[in-house]
Curated annotation (Swiss-Prot):
GO terms for cellular component: chromatin; nucleus. Belongs to the HMGN family. Interacts with transcriptional regulator SEHBP. It holds the Pfam family HMG14_17. Residues 1-101 are annotated as: Disordered. The modification Phosphothreonine is found at residue 82. This is Non-histone chromosomal protein HMG-14. The gene is HMGN1. Keywords: Acetylation, ADP-ribosylation, DNA-binding, Nucleus, Phosphoprotein. Its main location: nucleus. The modification N6-acetyllysine is found at residues 14, 27, 83.
Length: 101
């Protein structure tokens, strides 16, 4: 392996060793301020479409909820409980029986 030539003037002038990466020693680049107007306009169009589809989905969801509520009214109550539609009539019958006694 050949030996390096050492010059005193060259060593004194460079304080940083050569093996250090230029990327590490360089200052970070400033952030870009400009944005491209074409991409911004394209994003606006796509966001408008997304808003419209969300609105349509919301309407369908509300319609589905109303339909579900209507079907739930027709079905018997959950957990094996019965509806209390007949209970007011039975209360009246009990009151009449109590009066007749």
């Amino acid at each position: 392996m050949p030996k390096r030539k050492v010059s005193s003037a060259e060593g004194a002038a460079k304080e940083e060793p050569k093996r250090r990466s230029a990327r590490l020693s360089a200052k970070p680049a400033p952030a870009k301020v400009e944005t491209k107007p074409k991409k911004a306009a394209g994003k606006d169009k796509s966001s408008d479409k997304k808003v419209q589809t969300k609105g349509k989905r919301g309407a369908k969801g509300k319609q589905a909820e109303v339909a579900n509520q209507e079907t739930k009214e027709d079905l018997p109550a959950e957990n094996g409980e019965t509806k209390n539609e007949e209970s007011p009539a039975s209360d009246e019958a009990e009151e009449k029986e109590a009066k007749s006694d």
